[in-house]
Regions:
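P-loop NTPase Walker
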Residues: 1-105, 868, 910
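Conserved helicase NTPase motor core
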Residues: 4-16, 20-28, 84, 110-114, ...
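Helicase P-loop NTPase motor core
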Residues: 23-36, 40, 326-327, 334-429, ...
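Conserved P-loop NTPase-based nucleic-acid remodeling module centered on helicase motor cores
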Residues: 51-169, 318, 643
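Conserved helicase core region in the C-terminal RecA-like lobe
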Residues: 86-94, 269-273, 299, 413-415, ...
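Accessory C-terminal helicase-associated subdomains
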Residues: 221-224, 458-528, 536, 551-553, ...
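C-terminal accessory regions
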Residues: 473, 478-479, 693, 854, ...
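Conserved non-catalytic scaffold segment of RNase H-like nuclease domains
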Residues: 525-530, 535-633, 637-641, 657-674, ...
């Protein structure tokens, strides 16, 4: 069992529930994370389930990280890393990339990126749209229509369609009119045909063929469809996916594999927060489950189903419970909340949510301190403005009385959060705000992360576009994307434009591209095509077992130039390479094994004066470099072969449409000679075939590149990019594989961070949402060996110093989180390792992920109800709990929305661990400055009896 964890009877029942289909109903505080972790241990150790056959899905990344932390802290088995733990979108991304179902260079865009793309076709300023809630919703309809039409075209069942509101009654009428004019039935095929042929139907349905009213709605429909198509085509042309695509493409692939033979299925599945998943996500989970499954367990809570706006339905739990095979469990003990709070939660659940009282949990928490009598209270203020000030003053009192406790002001709307945050800042009270625009969605932070993204993958189109705009090459995102697309279309990477004059010692143009350098080497130099077999993938520590090579001039093998040596090692050689037996083990039995020093010296002498080339040469070059440092330090690879070529990079430049770039796949797809046997000599011959193929394509592209780069306008933009970003990029690349030192230029960043500021923002006033970090010195001390954070800080300081961005007052939260909660700089010291291990994870971060982490020193939080879900605080103040807001005025005649508002209020209540306060004003003024009485939310009618009443939030 987990350390210090003794399960109660209900928890033990769930832990031991193996085999069959199970549904666990668990209200907050019942210890789900502990149970889910212990189930993994038991399934492996007792039931014999392989970790790789386990699938653990959560609703949020934050929940997944929490579970991973618990797993790593309590299960010592290194193989537990094979368990997939994450949300559905994260799994779908991994599935699509891992199975080559999308182009390897694809990027995932968020809603802000999508708006930027669509604004180009709408002829609107993207920043105006981003700041206009109404316009954002109108744009969302277009995005939703695009995904909806995909589902209709692919024949998805109606129950799985997630954005049905993108087609309104007028749209249906318009399509019926079109079908009437055309003389065909109005069905799914007709809808798809209209969508795919907008211009044809625009010509067909002129004003002469329909009355004026019908003509207008037809034109509006066709305009919507045209925009949706343009958005779709733009994504397709630029290898972009939105979050809808991740789900849709995964479902399509799994659904087509009806025999379950092409893609991996899982025999042991557990899914948390199932009530928050939409029907498409549930269908994907069903398709991922092996038909001969061992155990499937869903966990949910009817009281917390608050994400209907994302397609989730409360009916999900009802449908699961009604399945004949379902074994139902209840967690009936709350281990988090004291009885006086649990009484409130249970009363509300029974009376407002109509939960059977027999299913509600009992208190399992024993109080450690006597009650003071002020744990539950109603706070009244005269007006909304007074309420903001009074609540902030009350928070200050709580901070003084309970300095180690956390306090959350939970609000119903982003505007409330802004008002409260502003008042907290005015009073100098440090806090962390989780609402409205997410820190991680800000253009400034996206720019910083784009720098990390291109260091990790220089083929990242979206990251380069953000950089090109961010460092001032273009003023708009659309222009930046067009420029980067023009480069990619000509097999040019933006990094090609960043080479310094020193890099071009042969006197070539500063902007000489990778293809140009390859063609020149191919035609003028002797190329050594080489490959290594190794004990593992760690370039810093693993040993080379075999080096094979051949010399080539103008695509022809130099006679007698074949080279192959086998090398001794004391390290363990893996018996398997994925699912195949490692052939190097048997091969070594038939060859003489040379010492490390002898073998490495032989290869260096063999390659002297030649250009090295490998497939995925970054790996081979760096593992060769570190083997030389250990065993033949007199040989300096940086001095003799600093500039090497990579056929993997060539293929990615010349064949961006390919979904996989492994040698075996390339030989098949491109119809080339060779064998990929995982023996270095065979792989060298296969690589040579790829190189010859690439030369033919590259030669044809060089003239096109020269013409493009010779254009004065392109040269001007390239010069700006090189001037503003070139030195930063080159210095970062030089640091990628540095493991044993901290750059001295980080010292200045440390000193600045110790004061809670960047060097470049020392004179800038703090922004409203964040306060100075009292423990910044400790944070800096921890971060001084985190290479990724150091790189992020360097780039940030450079941008602020050059006035390219405004200071990001919340950056210190991000760097602290990366340093303390994500990256283990002891196990992964270099920038290369940290980027390889965490680039994807970093790209998914949200503000709410930081709450509850060790990196947040603030004790006061301001959050909306939706973003508070899954979090807990010692003290909770539910702000402005008045009728008309809780529930919403527009929900009162809609039973479904009214019920969801009640569940939202339950979520807000149940965030409290120790103290709970309900705040309201008693009077509001309308636009004519006339006063109106305001009444307490009706959700309090059954629980008000538990609270002290008639006290002011100021205590006066």
């Amino acid at each position: 069992m987990l350390s210090n964890f003794t399960p109660d009877a209900c928890q033990r029942e769930v832990i031991e529930a193996q085999g069959g289909f199970h549904l666990v109903l668990a209200s907050p505080g019942c210890g789900k994370t502990q149970i889910l972790t212990e189930r993994i241990r038991r399934a492996h150790d007792v039931e014999g389930v392989a970790y790789a056959d386990m699938l653990c899905l959560t609703f949020t990344n934050r929940a997944a990280r929490g579970m991973l932390e618990r797993i790593n802290a309590n299960i010592a088995d290194s193989g537990v890393g094979d368990v997939f733990v994450g949300n559905v979108h994260r799994f779908c991304s991994k599935f699509l990339f891992g199975n080559g179902l999308i182009a390897a260079e694809s990027s995932v865009i968020d809603e802000d990126d999508a708006i930027s793309i669509l604004a180009r076709y709408m002829g609107e300023d993207e920043y105006s749209v981003l700041g206009d809630f109404k316009r954002r919703r109108e744009y969302s309809v277009i995005f939703h229509l695009e995904s909806m039409m995909h589902q209709i075209a692919m024949g998805h069942p109606k129950a799985l369609r997630t954005n049905t509101d993108s087609i309104n009654a007028d749209d249906v009428k318009a399509m019926q009119c079109i079908c009437s004019v055309r003389g065909c039935a109005f069905d799914a095929a007709a809808m798809v045909d209209i969508y795919n042929n907008v211009e044809t139907y625009r010509d067909l349905t002129t004003a002469d063929t329909a009355d004026y009213g019908d003509y207008q709605i037809i034109q509006r429909l066709l305009r919507k469809m045209q925009l949706a198509q343009q958005y779709h085509q733009y994504k397709k042309q630029n290898n972009l996916l939105d979050f809808h695509d991740l789900l849709l493409f995964t479902y399509d692939a799994l659904n087509a594999d009806s025999a379950q033979t092409e893609y991996k299925r899982y025999t042991w599945v557990q899914v948390d927060e199932v009530q928050d998943l939409n029907q498409l996500q549930l269908a994907i989970i069903k398709l991922l489950t092996a038909r001969a499954y061992r155990t499937v367990m869903f966990l949910g809570d009817e009281q917390q189903a608050i994400f209907s706006f994302m397609g989730a339905k409360l009916d999900t739990l009802t449908a699961l419970k009604q399945q004949s095979a379902c074994q139902l469990h209840h967690l009936s003990v709350n281990h988090r909340s004291p009885k006086y709070l649990l009484d409130i939660f249970n009363t509300f659940a029974a009376e407002e949510l109509h939960i059977d009282p027999a299913l509600l949990p009992d208190a399992g928490l024993q109080l450690q301190a006597p009650l003071l009598g002020n744990e539950l209270a109603l706070l009244y203020s005269e007006t909304y403005e007074h309420e903001v000030r009074d609540c902030v003053q009350f928070v200050d009192r709580l901070r003084t009385m309970f300095p180690e406790s956390t306090t959350a002001l939970i609000v119903n709307a982003n505007r409330d959060a802004e008002d409260i945050s502003g008042e907290l800042t005015r009073r100098g009270i440090g806090h962390f705000k989780v609402s409205g625009s997410d820190l991680f969605s800000s253009p400034e932070l996206k720019l910083l992360f784009a720098h990390l993204a291109v260091l990790n993958n220089e083929f990242n189109f979206l990251a380069w576009a953000r950089l090109v705009k961010g460092v001032g090459v273009y003023e708009t995102n659309a222009s930046a994307r067009n420029f980067v697309r023009a480069l990619f279309d000509r097999a040019i990477l933006p990094s090609d434009l960043l080479r310094s004059a020193a890099d071009e010692a042969e006197g070539q143009n500063v902007a000489a591209t990778y293809l140009q350098r390859f063609v020149r080497s191919y035609e003028e130099q002797t190329i050594v095509v080489f490959d290594t077999e190794t004990t593992g993938l760690n370039v810093f520590e693993d040993d080379i077992l075999q080096i094979a090579a051949v010399k080539m001039r103008n695509g022809v093998v130099v006679p007698g130039s074949e080279f192959c040596v086998y090398v001794e090692t004391d390290r363990e050689i893996p018996a398997m390479l994925g699912d195949i037996v490692n052939p190097i083990i048997e091969e070594r039995k038939h060859h003489t094994l040379l010492s490390h020093h002898a073998a490495l010296r032989m290869f260096m002498e063999y390659a002297d004066g030649c250009r090295l080339l490998g497939h995925n040469a970054d790996y081979d070059w760096h593992i060769l470099d570190h083997n030389l440092r250990r065993y033949a330090p007199e040989c300096d690879l940086h001095e003799s072969h600093a500039d090497y070529l990579d056929s993997l990079r060539l293929v990615r430049l010349l064949h961006p449409e390919l979904r996989e770039h492994k040698l075996k796949s390339l030989l098949t797809v491109l119809g080339l000679e060779g064998t990929n046997s995982h023996l270095a000599d065979d792989d060298v011959n296969a690589t040579r075939s790829v190189v010859v193929h690439c030369y033919g394509l590259a030669k044809a592209r060089v003239e096109q590149q020269l013409a493009f780069l010779g254009d004065a306008r392109v040269r001007q933009r390239a010069d700006i990019l090189r001037r503003n970003y070139g030195e930063i990029y080159r210095a970062a690349i030089a640091r990628m594989y540095v493991r044993d030192e901290v750059s001295s230029c980080f010292v200045g960043a440390l000193l600045a961070l110790a004061s809670g500021k960047s060097r470049a923002e020392t004179s800038a006033p703090p922004k409203a949402a964040y306060a100075e970090d009292k423990n910044a010195t400790d944070a800096a001390a921890m971060e001084n060996r985190v290479a990724l954070v150091a790189e992020l800080q360097r780039f940030y300081d450079a941008l602020v110093a050059d006035n390219m961005i405004q200071p990001i007052s919340g950056l210190r939260y991000v760097t602290a989180y990366l340093s303390k909660d994500m990256i283990d700089s002891t196990a992964e010291p270099s920038l290369y390792e940290q980027l390889s291990n965490h680039a994807m994870e970093i790209s998914t971060l949200k503000e709410a992920d930081l709450c509850g982490s060790s990196s947040i020193d603030e004790r006061i939080f301001v959050t909306t109800i939706h973003k508070a879900k899954g979090l807990e605080f010692d003290n909770v103040i539910i702000f402005d709990a008045v009728d008309g807001r809780m529930p919403n005025f527009y929900s009162r005649n809609n039973p479904r929305l009214l019920a969801e508002d009640a569940r939202k209020f339950y979520v807000a209540l149940s965030r409290a661990r120790s103290r709970l306060y309900i705040s309201q004003c008693i009077r509001r003024y309308d636009y004519r400055n006339m006063p109106h009485d305001v009444f307490t939310t009706p959700f309090m009618r059954h629980i008000a009896k538990y609270f002290q009443s008639n006290i002011s939030s100021t205590g006066q």
